[in-house]
Amino acid sequence: MSLINKEILPFTAQAFDPKKDQFKEVTQEDLKGSWSVVCFYPADFSFVCPTELEDLQNQYEELQKLGVNVFSVSTDTHFVHKAWHDHSDAISKITYTMIGDPSQTITRNFDVLDEATGLAQRGTFIIDPDGVVQASEINADGIGRDASTLAHKIKAAQYVRKNPGEVCPAKWEEGAKTLQPGLDLVGKI
């Protein structure tokens, strides 16, 4: 089921904050008020997951410039996130919040729970300041994501939000021409 244009559901969870090296509570309200990226992954101490999360960290500075808060989520506990951060070269670079979801509440809310394994699927969600999902990507377990595409999607989502009535065509870049859907464009693209 698509979550596009749907408001995120309530949750409360414990998270590891690598910037402060401490645990904290996170709720759906923390994903509101600014743009957010929520990146679900199957498990800590695994294989593809650390490559994805390191890639996301490599894009973190650019995402911060766009006013985006970044969160990762797995069904591991916040304690396991801390241990992984302390022992993995790739994960030790992470500075964004790592949410633990052992109750599977958030994972179910975003419809990325693999019921057979109890683990999260590889899902990425872009959420606007109102807490509404604007974009999503879900991949099979063996297919890692490319975080470099996030900034492009966020810029387009931010532009469309600020410019009602305009849409961004494929491969749109900031400053490029947009489209204004209407009868005058039907059959002319």
UniProtKB/Swiss-Prot annotation:
Induction: Induced by iron and osmotic shock. Repressed under metal-depleted growth conditions and by manganese-rich growth conditions. Negatively regulated by the ferric uptake regulator (Fur) and PerR.
Active site feature: 49 (cysteine sulfenic acid (-soh) intermediate)
Misc. remarks from the entry: In S.aureus, the removal of hydrogen peroxide appears to occur predominately via KatA, with AhpC acting as an alternative. The active site is a conserved redox-active cysteine residue, the peroxidatic cysteine (C(P)), which makes the nucleophilic attack on the peroxide substrate. The peroxide oxidizes the C(P)-SH to cysteine sulfenic acid (C(P)-SOH), which then reacts with another cysteine residue, the resolving cysteine (C(R)), to form a disulfide bridge. The disulfide is subsequently reduced by an appropriate electron donor to complete the catalytic cycle. In this typical 2-Cys peroxiredoxin, C(R) is provided by the other dimeric subunit to form an intersubunit disulfide.
Domain Thioredoxin: 2-159
Keyword Repeat attached: no
Keywords from the UniProt entry: Antioxidant, Cytoplasm, Disulfide bond, Oxidoreductase, Peroxidase, Redox-active center
Entries under Gene3D superfamilies matching the protein: Glutaredoxin
Family: Belongs to the peroxiredoxin family. AhpC/Prx1 subfamily.
GO MF, one example: NADH-dependent peroxiredoxin activity
Function of the protein: Thiol-specific peroxidase that catalyzes the reduction of hydrogen peroxide and organic hydroperoxides to water and alcohols, respectively. Plays a role in cell protection against oxidative stress by detoxifying peroxides. Is important for survival under desiccation conditions. Not required for virulence although is necessary for nasal colonization.
CDD domains named among the record's database cross-references: PRX_Typ2cys (cd03015)
PROSITE patterns: THIOREDOXIN_2
InterPro entries: AhpC, AhpC/TSA, Peroxiredoxin, Peroxiredoxin_AhpC-typ, Peroxiredoxin_C, Thioredoxin-like_sf, Thioredoxin_domain
UniProt-annotated location(s): Cytoplasm
Source organism of the structure: Staphylococcus aureus (strain NCTC 8325 / PS 47)
Subunit annotation: Homodimer; disulfide-linked, upon oxidation. 5 homodimers assemble to form a ring-like decamer.
GO biological process assignments: cell redox homeostasis; hydrogen peroxide catabolic process; response to oxidative stress
PANTHER family linked: ALKYL HYDROPEROXIDE REDUCTASE C (PTHR10681:SF121), THIOREDOXIN PEROXIDASE (PTHR10681)
Gene this chain is encoded by: ahpC
Protein name: Alkyl hydroperoxide reductase C
GO cellular component: cytosol
E.C. numbers: 1.11.1.26
